[in-house]
Amino acid sequence: MSDSKEPRLQQLGLLEEEQLRGLGFRQTRGYKSLAGCLGHGVLVLQLLSFTLLAGLFVQVSKVPSSISQEQSRQDSIYQNLTQLKAAVGELSEKSKLQEIYQELTQLKAAVSELPEKSKQQEIYQELTQLKAAVSELPEKSKLQEIYQELTQLKAAVSELPEKSKLQEIYQELTRLKAAVGELPEKCKLQEIYQELTRLKAAVDELPEKSKLQEIYQELTQLKAAVGELPEKSRLQEIYQELTQLKAAVERLCHPCPWEWTFFQGNCYFISNSQRNWHDSITACQEVGAQLVVIKSAEEQNFLQLQSSRSNRFTWMGLSDLNQEGTWQWVDGSPLLPSFKQYWNRGEPNNVGEEDCAEFSGNGWNDDKCNLAKFWICKKSAASCSRDEEQFLSPAPATPNPPPA
């Protein structure tokens, strides 16, 4: 019986040894002796417990690494989301427009899918609301107001006094015609024609017998009167006076052209049309003058009076176009401090780029250079000879010349 147990024990020993080898344990000589001493059962339990503890230790040691990997994965996902958000924020305007277009397309498709009945109901509701809004308009709506204005205008036209515009024009023409008829140019020929007309009427009214006699008498008296006229009759004297006056005028010195005004050795032209400041300079240059440059207080007072009389806004040759706030005349000379008193109160104020000066009211004003206004040209007067100056000046009273 003992002999049969020993082979079985050997087989068990070999099996345990292989299992331990599989678990990574190496049998030593001491181990074999110890196993032999303590018995195989207890040893197996101890070894199994030790193996389980070792495996558990290995698994526990792997937990922190898996947690760190999960954290790393979450960090990576967060970074990717951040980059994606930044990329979306950096989308071009074109992409945004495309998205809007897509939204609109989807909305259009959704609207087109509405049932026809729903569309009709919406249209009907809109029309109903519009009709209600129109019916709630006040009586005096825009069309009604326009109609009333036209009605009132028509009534006002129909109520115009008899002296309406056409009647006034007609009266003006009538007065003008009468004034023309009274012109002195109804001169000798017209008067002679009228006299002949009256004479013819008088002759026609004469009795047949006395007509020839009276005509003869009239002719005789006329002939006698003509014969008694002095050589220098009144008409001849007037003609001679006019001839002499014409010759004297032609000999006069003209320091300024016609329609120019003479003052202190200079000639001034005040325009009757309007131009902007730059074109006013050109207009003066075309007649050999320049846009007026003021040199004295007397000249300023004279020009200001001319401008205020006509109640016009008139350009002068002063601007601060070269440098804002530095006023300069067109001849390059600066504006003297003593002339700053001529600015109107609060001027110059450069409201809206006002860089050119004008006569305005009783003083000066700055205004926009591109505006059209009247202008004043200035140039030196022509010099007259000594004889002409004596001729122009009044002659002193002298006694009658001595007899020759």
Curated annotation (Swiss-Prot):
Gene3D superfamilies: Mannose-Binding Protein A, subunit A (3.10.100.10). Ca(2+) binds at residues 347, 349, 351, 354, 365-366. One of its GO terms (molecular function) is D-mannose binding. PROSITE patterns: C_TYPE_LECTIN_1, C_TYPE_LECTIN_2. It is found in: Membrane. It is a single-pass type II membrane protein. It holds the Pfam family Lectin_C. One of its GO terms (biological process) is cell adhesion. The tandem repeat domain, also called neck domain, mediates oligomerization. This is CD209 antigen. The lineage of its organism: Eukaryota, Metazoa, Chordata, Craniata, Vertebrata.
